[in-house]
């Protein structure tokens, strides 16, 4: 059986996008991993699946599978690629679509200049809802934010815990390019305080409207950009009194713009979404 796909990226965060409405998709975890493999498959940080919605008030259902075969709640860069995909494939003529994700609904808008704006919803800051086990950890306040001390490779690192539909631990560092992201990232990802694992963000403040960001993504490792990670970092920075909205987020893959008015207001992310190529892959070539 041949599986049709489209290869896309959002600021270098790359995806295999599958139309699950017009073709049957039923892959094993091993097949998901092989499809995402840069040696044995197409290669991607994550795989995005377009499906029919399960509720009447949305246009599509949006599923995300990590490179390790695990399914996750949300991906902001993927959401931008999602709306470009359904538009380019003629699956909708709307410029703005409502999309069902694992734990809610998001709104995606294709702008006239080709950029895509995603209404990411309000951030979740209550530890139990991140989810994050804060009990017993050292803590102190900075601005309106609570910082928690995690033991990481023999050091105590202070993080903010934020959910943007998926969990994030955000840490402010002086020099993000020379910070040991590849060493600390997996330790934070698997820290027992995060029962569902966590995306680890490392943020350097440039000025009150700009940051540099690296993210070690849960189930994918360090990626060139992470949309939900950019949102979580800006939320944490604003709450700590370090940033003012809007904020330009510089990643290795490109620039995103994040706006948030605080409190229960939604976070809005704007950035690029690029189609690279289309193809098909023989599922028989993938391990079962």
Swiss-Prot record:
Indicate the residues that form the catalytic site: 75, 226
**Please, one GO biological process term?**
lysine biosynthetic process via diaminopimelate
- GO terms under cellular component: cytosol
Where substrate binds, per the record, is at 13, 46, 66, 76-77, 166, 199, 217-218, 227-228
Its Enzyme Commission number(s) read 5.1.1.7
Keyword Iron assigned to the entry: answer is: no
What is this enzyme's catalytic activity, as reactions?
A: (2S,6S)-2,6-diaminopimelate = meso-2,6-diaminopimelate
| Principal EC category | isomerase
Which keywords are on file for this protein? Amino-acid biosynthesis, Cytoplasm, Isomerase, Lysine biosynthesis
Q: In which pathway does it act?
A: Amino-acid biosynthesis; L-lysine biosynthesis via DAP pathway; DL-2,6-diaminopimelate from LL-2,6-diaminopimelate: step 1/1
Chief location: cytoplasm
Q: What molecular functions are annotated in GO for this chain?
A: diaminopimelate epimerase activity
Protein location: Cytoplasm
Record site feature (Could be important to modulate the pK values of the two catalytic cysteine residues), residues: 168, 217
What does the annotation say about its assembly with partners?
Homodimer.
Give the HAMAP family listed for this entry: DAP_epimerase
Q: Which family does it belong to?
A: Belongs to the diaminopimelate epimerase family.
The UniProt function text for this chain reads:
Catalyzes the stereoinversion of LL-2,6-diaminopimelate (L,L-DAP) to meso-diaminopimelate (meso-DAP), a precursor of L-lysine and an essential component of the bacterial peptidoglycan.
Can you say what this protein is called? Diaminopimelate epimerase
Q: Which gene encodes it?
A: dapF
